[in-house]
Design a protein with these regions (language model features):
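Non-catalytic accessory regions of SAM-dependent methyltransferases
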Residues: 1-53, 59-62
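Conserved AdoMet
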Residues: 2, 41-119
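A general structural signal for alpha-helical elements within enzymatic catalytic domains
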Residues: 28-29, 75, 122
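Residue-level signal for short amphipathic helical patches enriched in basic/charged
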Residues: 34, 49, 65, 124, ...
Length: 141
């Protein structure tokens, strides 16, 4: 069964932002460790708005086409597709990096590794960094 069909009662024409967030959160509870956050990020992506916009417009009616797109995004996430691959973007040290199915998604542990390396390397030391692999180039950046 598709996400669109399963969420149809909650995604009826004229659904508000808060209703869509609630439906999305419920849909992802069985497949995500952070269903509310995932629902928020996916709805913001479907709307092409920042996540903070959602809370400023909880009672706003979401266009039917956008709600359908959101349902499709929820279906991808429920199928365990990484959020960064769905949205095509992942933050790394506050930089927005493009992500595709061909790249490894930067992980929080990698940020910690970079922080540890920067603490141990003298600030005046000249060096070159090679970021090898199939990632986004986040470490070298």
């Amino acid at each position: 069964m598709s996400a669109e069909r399963s969420l149809a009662p909650d995604l009826a024409a004229g659904s508000r932002t808060d209703e869509l967030l609630g439906a999305g959160t419920r849909w992802l509870e069985a497949s995500s460790d952070s269903p509310r956050l995932d629902a928020e990020l996916l709805l913001a992506h479907a709307l092409d708005k920042p996540r903070t916009w959602l809370y400023q417009t909880l009672s706003a009616v979401v266009p039917t086409e956008t709600a359908a797109r959101y349902a499709a995004l929820l279906g991808q996430r429920a199928a365990h597709r990484p959020l960064a691959q769905i949205t095509g973007m992942r933050e790394f040290w506050s930089l927005g990096l493009q992500v595709t199915v061909d790249t490894l998604v930067p992980r929080p542990e990698t940020e910690l590794l970079v922080e540890l390396a920067l603490r141990r390397i003298p600030a005046d030391m000249q060096m070159a960094v090679a970021d090898l692999g199939t990632g986004t180039g986040a470490i070298a950046i």
